[in-house]
Amino acid sequence: SSWDGTMYQYPVDGDRHYLKYRKDVIDNPEMQKKYKADTGKELKVPTTWKEYGEMAKYFNGWDWDGDGEKEYGSAEVMKKDDLMFAAFYSRSAAYSKNPRTPGGFFFDLETMTPLINNPGFVEALTDWVDAVNYVPPGGINFGLGDEINSFGGGQTLFSFSWDDAFVAAMQDDSPIKNQVGAAQLPGADKVWNRENGMWDAKANQAPFFVWGWAVGVAKKSKEKEMAFDYLCFFANEANHQADIGIGRFG
């Protein structure tokens, strides 16, 4: 992380959100045939939030994996003050972050006017309000731990957040080990253009880095170069790859 050409922090963890889904459903020819017959649409990894919602609704509230229990559409962090904001921003980015209008996502960089009320964010909120129709019972009060356990325990078709739910799903005690897939966050078929005040009717995906960690070196350190050299090692690709798969955390 730098400002005006001077490095102040070294990124060591990029906490991006991504989509988790049940491969045994999405890639299942019989399920694809049934979904096509019932909806007229293809069952595939969703590339837009509208598709995500349609599929999640279809697979909500019935036993689609044959375990004797009802499954649901999506596990999401919806609980107030429990990282709910992160889930909302991930849903908002595709509608609001237009590559034709570079600059701020949360604020206009020239005026610092908040952008949270623009139609892109409103469209995402409209989708999210509808999501209460395809989450598990009590899902509107799910915190991060609930989302992890719900998807990781085989309760839902989809979830999206950090690595935790995927890692949980791949544990030896998970009923869905090796039955989950990962993909980029869904996008949108339109994106708000704040410069002309209109929707751009174009496909848009905007992967969102939610959170992240960085390390700095103390100003009074006598070995700044050595410290930064260690950080380069600590944050190398091999260490990141190893870190992703360790434990029930992202």
Map each language-model feature to its residues.
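Periplasmic solute-binding protein
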Residues: 1-41, 53, 76-110, 205-218
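Short helices/loops that flank or line small-molecule/ion binding pockets
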Residues: 26, 51-59, 145-159
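A local structural motif
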Residues: 33-45, 110-113, 129-143, 155, ...
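Acidic, glycine-anchored loop motifs typical of Ca2+
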Residues: 39-41, 63-70
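Glycine-centered hinge/linker elements that transmit conformational signals in sensory
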Residues: 49-59, 87, 94-141, 184-190
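Extracytoplasmic/periplasmic substrate-recognition and gating elements
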Residues: 133, 173-250
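A ligand-binding cleft/hinge motif common to bilobed small-molecule-binding domains
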Residues: 152, 161-177, 189
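Paired acidic/hydrophobic, glycine-rich loop segments that form the ligand-binding mouth/hinge
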Residues: 157-162, 181
